[in-house]
Regions:
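Solvent-exposed serine/threonine-rich low-complexity stretches and specific carbohydrate-binding patches
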Residues: 92-93, 100-116
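Short, solvent-exposed loop/turn segments at the edges of extracellular beta-sandwich modules
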Residues: 82, 144-149
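Short glycine/proline/serine/threonine-rich loop/turn segments at secondary-structure transition edges
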Residues: 129-137
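Conserved structural position at the C-terminal beta-strand
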Residues: 140-142
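Aromatic sugar-binding surface patches on proteins
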Residues: 114-125, 132
């Protein structure tokens, strides 16, 4: 009877150890907690397009070459770095370098009750008549309610830069 009691105690000890190990493994395999709000850099990306009035056949066509008087459209998306989802509190500004000076253009959030699928920010710049022909450098900065920031810069490939042509 004494050996049966020892076997039972030994079996219970083994079961407890195996259970503790299984729980420990499950905990170590769970997803890590997302970072606290306010940490990380915002993810900012987008494109430029011709912003003609709605119904115009060339409205929203992607391009990088524009003429004086053309409406350049900037479209951007901002994501929270911890979730990958849209950061609705973000404030965006386009910074253009034109003729040796910087022009700042605030962006606005595009989605409306009638068009909720447009979950991006937009800004329009009418190319002034006095703008020199050539490349116009730009960046877009974003800041959210937590103080996080992010920046979009186009690729450093001359052929893909915002360019003013005759």
């Amino acid at each position: 009877m004494r050996s049966t009691g020892l076997v039972t105690v030994f079996a219970i000890v083994i079961a407890v150890l195996v259970g503790a190990q299984a729980g420990s493994s499950a905990m170590s395999q769970s997803a890590p907690a997302p970072p606290s709000p306010g940490q990380g850099r915002l993810i900012v990306y987008g494109d430029i397009a011709l912003f003609q009035p709605p119904g115009h056949p060339e409205n929203c066509i992607l391009r990088n070459r524009f003429k004086r008087g053309d409406p350049v459209g900037f479209r951007m998306f901002v994501a929270d770095p911890s979730t990958g989802k849209r950061e609705e509190s973000a404030q965006l500004v386009v910074h253009l370098t034109v003729g040796g000076r910087t022009v700042d253009i605030p962006m606005r959030y595009r989605a409306t009750a009638a068009q909720p699928e447009r979950e991006f920010w937009v800004a329009k710049w009418l190319v002034p008549q006095e703008t020199p022909v050539g490349i116009v450098r730009f960046t877009v900065t974003a800041t959210d309610k937590y103080g996080r920031t992010g920046e979009f810069k186009p690729f450093e490939v001359q052929a893909s830069q915002l360019t003013i042509a005759e």
